[in-house]
A protein has these predicted regions:
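Hydrophobic/small residue at the entry helix of a nucleotide-binding pocket
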Residues: 12
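Helix N-cap at the beta1-alpha1 junction of Rossmann-like dinucleotide-binding domains, i.e.
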Residues: 36-40, 104
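Rossmann-fold cofactor-recognition segment
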Residues: 47-60
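Conserved Rossmann-fold cofactor-binding substructure of NAD(P)-dependent oxidoreductases
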Residues: 58-69
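N-terminal Rossmann-like NAD(P) cofactor-binding module of classical short-chain dehydrogenase/reductase
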Residues: 72-76, 97-99
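ADP-ribose/adenylate-binding Rossmann-like module
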Residues: 89-107
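Rossmann-fold NAD(P)-binding glycine/threonine-rich loop
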Residues: 101-123
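C-terminal catalytic/substrate-binding lobe primarily of soluble NAD(P)-dependent oxidoreductases
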Residues: 145-434
Length: 434
């Protein structure tokens, strides 16, 4: 019997666990799953005979090493900052590893050691990154095999709320880490390539300079640029590609509303504001409106927004005009106060379903003519456990686990799923899930 060690069984692991257990008898697997929330973990394992629940500090190398040593494959669903430590343990113990997260510079530096240990460390095998890579590379390789020249590649993905559960004017609810949403785009300019030229898009313009796209049967979405698109030129073997843009999808008017919050300063996370025990959202908002006259907060905000004053209902809906609610935090950054409000306004309800939308656009030249291919994927969650995010992250990880254990994937070292021998069988099986 082959042992699979799963470190972390949180939000995105439900579908992964189900797949591993559903296939465990036929594949002769035993799943050892680890999470500090033992009750939640046992609920997900459902008393399956091929599953064993463990509750210990998976962040402690000395504690987890004995479990890694007994495993044939390790899957880390821990926060991304802990993957390198797990990878170092796997190299020392010569155990294969899968993570759904981006390859960090520290992880990439382990490539030679992983190859020397004869193991694969598979990263970026979730949805974004993951399915986006695989679905893109399939089409890129097809274009190249036709003797055509790729001119432009744009790729967008977004974790959103399903239309049936869309009940607010922002058309958004938290389906992922709220803090990551509030701080999205901060820290450095977005970099992409357009018509052969590098473009830098600073944070204060990120949600202004957006692109609208349409997905069949789901309408219009708006995309803002991700942090670094040009790193994927090498990843995809497209160093000479004139245009590459990767971005995140939202539903209008989200980007316009979020841009207004940025311009006000409400997403700032570099300084704190004291709460004397009476600090309300209305007071927070008034702090950032640059007018000293006696007009109401609403009137001053309308003046600040100018031609975008029609965004006022968005501010009202998330509670920024509220003069009764008192913030719980005693001291916080503007972004943290904003997050406290948004976690109330954008909380996923018990019957809400999430939605994952992915869109690719390829423009290529063949025989003197330009052609365009559009490719899209929409996944809608089943319920609060088997969400669209859980499905689209968990299934690729699970299928990759099977392929590694069955030695279908032979590649060693630190890698990602941009190679045919990896993406073809994974995409083929994913198609069975729609």
């Amino acid at each position: 019997m082959k042992n699979i060690l799963l470190l972390g069984a949180g939000l995105s692991a439900s579908t992964l666990i189900k797949y591993l257990l559903d296939h465990s008898i036929a594949e002769n697997w035993q799943l050892h799953a680890v999470d500090q929330d033992l009750q939640m973990l046992q609920s997900k394992l459902g008393g399956h005979p091929n599953a064993i629940a463990h509750s210990f500090n998976a962040l402690d190398s000395e504690v987890r090493k004995p479990y890694i040593e007994k495993a044939d494959l390790v899957i880390s669903m821990l926060p991304a900052i802990y993957h390198v430590g797990v990878a170092q343990d796997c190299i020392a113990l010569k155990k294969n590893l899968i993570t759904p997260s981006y390859i960090s510079d520290e992880m990439r530096a382990l490539d030679a050691n992983a190859k020397a240990a004869g193991i694969v460390i598979m990263n970026e095998i979730g949805v974004d990154p993951g399915i986006d890579h695989m679905s893109a590379m399939k089409i890129i390789h097809q274009i190249q095999e036709e003797g055509a020249t790729l001119l432009s590649f744009k790729s967008y993905c977004g974790g959103l709320i399903a239309p049936v559960s869309d009940t607010n004017q922002w058309h958004y609810k938290f389906t992922w880490n709220p803090r990551n949403v509030v701080l999205a785009g901060q820290g450095a300019a977005a970099i992409y390539k357009e018509a052969g030229a590098l473009k830098y898009l600073p944070y204060h313009r990120l949600f202004q300079q957006t692109e609208f796209i349409s997905v069949p049967n789901y309408g219009q979405f708006e995309a803002y640029a991700n942090r670094n698109s040009i790193s994927y030129l090498e990843t995809y073997g497209l160093q000479d590609l004139p245009t590459i843009i990767r971005g995140t999808l939202r539903v209008p008017p989200f980007c316009a509303g979020w841009n207004a919050l940025i311009q006000l300063g409400l997403t700032e996370d570099t300084y704190t504001i004291q709460n004397d025990g009476s600090f309300t959202p209305r007071m927070l908002l008034n702090t950032f409106i640059p007018f000293k006259d006696q007009r109401s907060v609403e009137q001053k905000l309308a003046a600040f927004l100018g031609e975008n004053a029609d965004l006022l209902p968005l501010f009202e809906e998330i509670g920024l005009f509220d003069a009764n609610y008192v913030f719980k935090a005693t001291v916080a950054t503007p972004a943290q106060y904003l997050q406290e409000l948004l976690e109330k306004a954008w909380k996923l309800g018990p019957t809400d379903n999430d939605m994952l939308v992915m869109y690719h656009e390829f423009i290529y030249e063949k025989a003197g003519k330009n052609f365009k291919i559009e490719s899209s994927m929409v996944a809608i969650g089943q319920d609060q456990r088997f969400t669209a995010m859980s499905d689209t992250v968990g299934l690729p990880v699970a299928i990759a686990a099977k392929l590694i254990l069955n030695q279908t994937i032979q590649r060693k070292g630190v890698t990602l799923p941009v190679y045919k021998e990896i993406y073809q069988p994974i995409l083929s099986e994913l198609e069975q899930y729609g």
